[in-house]
């Protein structure tokens, strides 16, 4: 019988370091939590006395940027001056989190991390109203660094050396304010910004559509809706903190100006958006007695409503089918009318043919009567030559009248 000794060999190799570690002391590693450009990194810790310690430092991308060894002292302490960060971040030394890994020849390891960040100045900002009362909830921004004031009206920004525009956007009814500042790291600065009451203030209370239901919108709030639907905006306008009902509220959308209607305490704007894919800004503003309110800009994204397109196409198809059915019925009716007219024409042709035969017969009868009349007339003339009496003439006249009556009767009978 053959035995596979490989698992036993691997097990012995794994157990041996563990047995050694059971009697060996651990190793610690420390460094300061944050470094800035131009600062030197120091690593220190404790392990067993006179022990060789390996140290490796990895940048945020996991690439080793430093590796070295040192030996602990008689009491087990070790320290190492690793490297100095450049004055600007680089590909090798980017800003971010660095990892320090240490290990001893006896098999102990440990690790820690530190941050490499720009050297910054501490900027304390105090936001107050004209009476000096702190304003809570104001957004303070310098470039991409943002903070919000607390209940004491204070916000703290950490900014690298440079010149900035400090922007303050307070809650209603206060108007935004800004101030240009210059700071040098690592100094600490304090700024006090006073915000004024917005005499004419516009607040967008809600935005609704079949798939949108947003409340208390501020400038920059994004709206995403489906095309072919209607967006309803409800706003309030206050003057010196009091609601007013006679302001003019407008919304500029896709190059078209929409005017609001005042209803039940709100200015209502209804916008029908086409069923096409596009992005635009919805800009809302109020005017009152020559004053202009704050501007609220709402980025609007419209997505295509494919179901509405399909429904419209189905409706169009049904309408066309109905029209085709109606046209088919009309064609059938016209065909029937043509057939009826054809039968009528055929009947009239037969009648005309019969009338032609009747006329020919009447013409023959008239010709016969005319011949008989000529014969009678000749006889009358002969009689007139023999006697010339009135009685004979009268008799001939009567006979002529009778013949005419007979002819007329025959003609009327033929026609009827």
From Swiss-Prot:
Transmembrane portions of the chain: 392-412
Q: Where in the cell is it found?
A: Secreted, Cell wall, S-layer; Cell membrane
Q: Signal peptide position in this chain?
A: 1-20
What membrane topology was assigned to this protein in its record? Answer: Single-pass membrane protein
Q: Which GO terms describe its cellular component?
A: extracellular region; plasma membrane; S-layer
What protein family does this chain belong to? Belongs to the Sulfolobales SlaB family.
Name of this protein: S-layer protein B
């Amino acid at each position: 019988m053959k035995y596979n000794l490989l698992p036993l060999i691997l097990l012995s190799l794994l157990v041996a370091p563990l047995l050694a570690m059971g009697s060996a002391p651990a190793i610690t590693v420390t460094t300061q939590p944050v470094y800035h450009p131009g600062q030197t990194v120091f690593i220190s810790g404790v392990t067993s006395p006179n022990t060789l310690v390996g140290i490796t430092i990895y940048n945020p991308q996991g690439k080793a940027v430093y590796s070295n060894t040192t030996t602990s002292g008689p009491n087990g302490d070790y320290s190492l001056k690793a490297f100095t960060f450049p004055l600007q971040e680089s590909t090798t030394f980017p800003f971010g989190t660095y990892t320090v890994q240490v290990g001893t020849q006896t098999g102990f390891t440990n690790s820690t991390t530190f941050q490499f960040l720009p050297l910054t100045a501490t900027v304390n900002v105090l936001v107050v109203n004209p009476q000096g009362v702190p304003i809570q909830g104001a957004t303070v921004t310098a470039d991409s660094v943002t903070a919000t004031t607390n209940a004491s009206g204070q916000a703290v920004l950490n900014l690298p050396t440079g010149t900035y525009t400090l922007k303050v956007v307070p809650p209603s009814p206060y108007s935004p304010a800004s101030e240009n500042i210059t700071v040098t790291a690592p100094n600490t600065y304090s700024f006090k910004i006073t915000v004024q009451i917005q005499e004419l203030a516009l607040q967008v209370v809600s935005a609704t559509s079949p798939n949108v239901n947003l409340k208390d919108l501020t400038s920059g709030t994004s709206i995403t809706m489906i095309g072919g639907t209607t967006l309803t905006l409800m706003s309030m306008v206050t003057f010196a903190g009091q609601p007013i009902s006679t302001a003019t509220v407008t919304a500029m959308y896709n190059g078209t100006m929409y005017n609001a209607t005042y209803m039940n305490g709100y200015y209502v704007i209804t916008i029908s958006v086409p069923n096409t894919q596009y992005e635009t800004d919805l800009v809302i503003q109020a005017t009152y007695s020559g004053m202009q309110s704050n501007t609220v800009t709402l980025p609007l994204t419209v997505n295509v409503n494919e179901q509405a397109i399909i429904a419209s196409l189905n409706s169009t198809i049904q309408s066309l089918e109905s029209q085709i059915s109606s046209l088919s019925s009309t064609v059938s009716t016209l065909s029937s009318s043509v057939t009826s007219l054809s039968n009528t024409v055929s009947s009239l042709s037969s009648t005309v043919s019969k009338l032609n035969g009747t006329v020919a017969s009447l013409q023959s009868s008239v010709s016969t009567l005319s011949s008989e009349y000529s014969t009678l007339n000749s006889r009358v003339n002969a009689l007139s030559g023999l006697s010339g009496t009135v009685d004979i003439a009268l008799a001939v006249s009567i006979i002529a009248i009778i013949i005419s009556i007979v002819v007329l009767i025959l003609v009327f009978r033929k026609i009827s």
